[in-house]
Amino acid sequence: MENETVSELNQTELPPQVAVALEYQVVTILLVVVICGLGIVGNIMVVLVVMRTKHMRTATNCYLVSLAVADLMVLVAAGLPNITDSIYGSWVYGYVGCLCITYLQYLGINASSCSITAFTIERYIAICHPIKAQFLCTFSRAKKIIIFVWAFTSIYCMLWFFLLDLNISTYKDAIVISCGYKISRNYYSPIYLMDFGVFYVMPMILATVLYGFIARILFLNPIPSDPKENSKTWKNDSTHQNKNMNLNTTNRCFNSTVSSRKQVTKMLAVVVILFALLWMPYRTLVVVNSFLSSPFQENWFLLFCRICIYLNSAINPVIYNLMSQKFRAAFRKLCNCKQKPTEKAANYSVALNYSVIKESDRFSTELDDITVTDTYVSTTKVSFDDTCLASEKNGPSSCTYGYSLTAKQEKI
């Protein structure tokens, strides 16, 4: 008797001759509880740190929040029901649960794929077309794109409402209820293949091509200059020492920008690679079963496929913590119970020594401003007063210009 389930994610059909082994139940429950539990906590933390930290409300992080919400949906809708499946060996959520849970499963799966595609395109534009990125890669535009992604996937996944039904199988010693199709395999196999092509093959091909272009820019060619950075030019210095200082400062800022972009791109590339690898077993199984007269449904292999999917949805916060200093600091602050609700501006006093040239009765210098970067301060342009604090001497001399830098401490 042919009785297919909607997907191996919530597969509940048992072979007629044997019940699920006790060790299988124990391993399934243990792995699902640990992986899904940690994944749910981690993805909630990602959403909270981006929403609570103003500095982290960037276009890229906006897509990561969308990915975190999609992963939460997968972990809750696809992961946790497997615990009851393992305990009871049957579907216990009824007809409405069959419709809603399956809908949320595929909504989370497809939304995560679209979110990954969106931030891949965003990274490509930001690095390879920095001028266009000034108006294309903005936080407000990212929110609009995410709204479109979720609207599209929500409508697309409504297809499952018309395909699902409860299937009842009667065996010698048990009656098994499963959430499955009310149509034959000849009709739903093309749906699986379309889903495989649109939400897995095409995004992975696009990501491979775009990250190839990104790698060429970041690692083989000089990175295109940011127009905002180009506008912050230094005046020509009247001494050789000032010229060297300006050149060194500019090089440090440039190298810092390149290093930061490389690190962000590496982190996102790891997310994409893990998505491709961890989804491959399940996606491959679906395609293969579409062409088999008797689908392959070995319990331990199905468990392996499910665990790979749950790992993909749970591991992203770990990647952010390992590869992003900002996320790591934000996670630490979120876990700190003594964290203050608001952060006030912090004052910084810096002394700067450099040479000036005496012209008649006054000192003249070409260094009118400087860009200061601190671990906890935004890159800030500081202007200097004309009064030299040092004693006047004949010829070129060294004097100290004092200033007080007041800047709002960045929330990382």
Swiss-Prot record:
GO molecular function (one): identical protein binding
Question: Where would I find glycosylation on this chain?
Answer: 3, 10
The family classification in the record reads:
Belongs to the G-protein coupled receptor 1 family.
Q: Where in the cell is it found?
A: Cell membrane
Write down a Pfam family by its short name.
Answer: 7tm_1
What domain of life? Eukaryota
Q: List the disulfide bonds.
A: 98-179
Q: What does this protein do?
A: Receptor for thyrotropin-releasing hormone (TRH). Upon ligand binding, this G-protein-coupled receptor triggers activation of the phosphatidylinositol (IP3)-calcium-protein kinase C (PKC) pathway.
Membrane-spanning ranges = 29-51, 62-83, 100-121, 145-168, 194-215, 267-288, 297-319
Q: What species is given as this protein's source?
A: Rattus norvegicus
- Which residue stretches are annotated as topological domain Extracellular? 1-28, 84-99, 169-193, 289-296
User: What are the record keywords, sorted?
Assistant: Cell membrane, Disulfide bond, G-protein coupled receptor, Glycoprotein, Membrane, Receptor, Transducer, Transmembrane, Transmembrane helix
Question: One GO CC annotation, please?
Answer: cell surface
Cytoplasmic topological domain ranges are 52-61, 122-144, 216-266, 320-412
The major lineage groups are:
Eukaryota, Metazoa, Chordata, Craniata, Vertebrata
Q: What InterPro entries does the annotation carry? A: GPCR_Rhodpsn, GPCR_Rhodpsn_7TM, TRH_rcpt_1
Gene Ontology BP annotations: phospholipase C-activating G protein-coupled receptor signaling pathway; positive regulation of cytosolic calcium ion concentration; positive regulation of protein-containing complex assembly
Record's protein name = Thyrotropin-releasing hormone receptor
Q: How does it sit in the membrane?
A: Multi-pass membrane protein
Its signal peptide is none
Q: Does the keyword Nuclease apply?
A: no
